[in-house]
Amino acid sequence: MPGIRTQMTGPARAAARAGVLLMLAAACSNGGHDEDASAPDSVSADTTAAEPVVLEEAFLTERDTLDNVDSPTVWNGPNGEHWILTSAKTTDVVLVNDAATGAEIRRLGGTGSGRGQLDRPNGVRAIDDLLFVVERDNARIQAFSLPSLESMGTFGEEELLRPYGIAAYEDAEGRIEIYVTDNYELVEDEIPPDSALGERVEQFRVWVEDGELRDEHVRSFGDTTGEGVLRKVETIGVDPANDRVVVAEELGPDSHWKIYRLDGTFSGEVFGRGYFPQEAEGLALYTCPDGGGYWIATDQGMGENTFHVFDRRTLEHLGAFAGVTTRNTDGVALTQAGFGPFPAGAFYAIHNDGNVAAFSWAEIAAALGLRTDCTEGAAPADSAQ
């Protein structure tokens, strides 16, 4: 059942959504993309930097391209559980694997629209004792309890049209703030005109009260003019300490990252231009208590598949790495918890639709001169898809 609403009733919100769709459709007649964009604040790119360091994967999970996997997230439980949870778009499940060995533990879901069922799951995010799964073709988000993996309910049905990526953090009151990208189309396989792109991101607030999932829709956002316009979206990340919501603009040939504020306003900042000639995809954040850390962002490709590292605060490009085997990466995830073979944490990346590759953070850090001192006692860092 859907989560308990705290604002409009379902019918009222559905009617409001229908009105928005009419306005979006009307916008199609008002012209195409706005090319008169003002110059944003941008971190300059020296794309002549050295080739990425190539690192051997610690392991790859068992491969099955029929699953068509997309995005991983990591959960470190209170009783020694360390799981990778990965969406499988074709088989409509979430794969649960041991994060230390890659061994499969179970599969969650199955095709359908009922409680506990999934339809083209895409972005996933584990936070505290909840797993959130974005379902593109059910146009909703479903929450599952951890470690039981029982469905807690769904939300977003009145707001979402074609959702993909998810990012989340816990606020000061213990509620979970969730940002979801919505790559809706008004005509199949066509990007709407800029004037119709004002709802590319939906924000929700979620909490559990008396054993029930409760949610409220906070806002829809996305600029419709200028540099902040989001034309093709999937991956999203959030850094509340720096008031940043980071969204990939996947539309080539100028794929890069745009920075919005937590309140949904465009900051004027973009970064990564020149580093993503193929497509900006999976994103993860490594955080340190002193405010330092790194964004790890993927340039997805079959021939060259590169993970770029940017300074968390300045957004300066610090280096890049690639896997010996890993190619065509959609989502990624990072954990700063030390366990098993990964005393400084681990980085996980999708490999060409079929399985998940694991990398030691200690090895990544050694190769690129990065920090490893933000591990002990750290919660899993935000992952985004």
Name the predicted role of every residue range.
Residues 1-4, 42:
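Intrinsically disordered, low-complexity Ser/Thr- and Pro-rich stretches
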Residues 24-27:
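C-terminal motif of bacterial Sec signal peptides marking the signal peptidase cleavage site
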Residues 29-385:
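Sequence/structural signature of beta-propeller domains
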